[in-house]
Amino acid sequence: MSGHTSVSFLLLSIVALGMVATVICSCDSEFSSEFCERPEESCSCSTHTCCHWARRDQCMKPQRCISAQKGNGRRRLIHMQK
């Protein structure tokens, strides 16, 4: 019975480490694969903020969020002028 418990614990540990590695890797990038609901919501990466933009609110670095929002405004203005 203890052999079964050891295998279960080992598998659970591997899955948990994989999830932690995914979060750590995505914190280095400008954009996260994590989506959020509201701009005040916290992201799992301390370097990312919840950014509201055209497609869907997404966690990203603050500077990238500012660039994305400026780009969306410019595209919207060009579309309205046509």
Curated annotation (Swiss-Prot):
One cellular-component annotation, GO: extracellular region
GO molecular function: toxin activity
Record remark: domains: The cysteine framework is XII (C-C-C-C-CC-C-C).
Record has tRNA processing as a keyword: no
4-carboxyglutamate: residues carrying this PTM: 30, 34, 37, 40-41
Domain of life: Eukaryota
Post-translational modification (record): Contains 4 disulfide bonds.
Chain positions found as Asparagine amide: 72
Leader sequence residues: 1-25
Tissues in which the UniProt entry reports expression: Expressed by the venom duct.
Species this protein is from: Conus textile
Name of protein: Conotoxin Gla-TxX
Propeptide residues according to the Swiss-Prot or TrEMBL record: 77-82
Subcellular location, principal: secreted
Localisation per UniProt entry: Secreted
Keywords (A to Z) from UniProt: Amidation, Cleavage on pair of basic residues, Disulfide bond, Gamma-carboxyglutamic acid, Secreted, Signal, Toxin
Family: Belongs to the conotoxin I2 superfamily.
